[in-house]
């Protein structure tokens, strides 16, 4: 009787393990990389926001970033709104 129960649980456990390694773990790694990138922002970095705005970091505090665009307009965003960073130019 115990063998039958164990035999039905093994495939379910294997499915959860595969699901974890194919879906959940890569997403966690990506979120960690994005979080690290946002924490390492510095003045002068060229950035792209999640809305597609391109600009240069003008100033930073703990939760907000001021971005200067091509026409010297300054816009304030949450740090979480930064999608990509390229090195300071």
Curated annotation (Swiss-Prot):
Main location: membrane
Coiled coil region boundaries: none
Single GO BP term: protein transport
Ranges that cross the membrane: 4-24
Protein role: The SecYEG-SecDF-YajC-YidC holo-translocon (HTL) protein secretase/insertase is a supercomplex required for protein secretion, insertion of proteins into membranes, and assembly of membrane protein complexes. While the SecYEG complex is essential for assembly of a number of proteins and complexes, the SecDF-YajC-YidC subcomplex facilitates these functions.
Assembly behavior: Part of the SecDF-YidC-YajC translocase complex. The SecDF-YidC-YajC translocase forms a supercomplex with SecYEG, called the holo-translocon (HTL).
Protein name as it appears in the record: Sec translocon accessory complex subunit YrbF
Protein species of origin: Bacillus subtilis (strain 168)
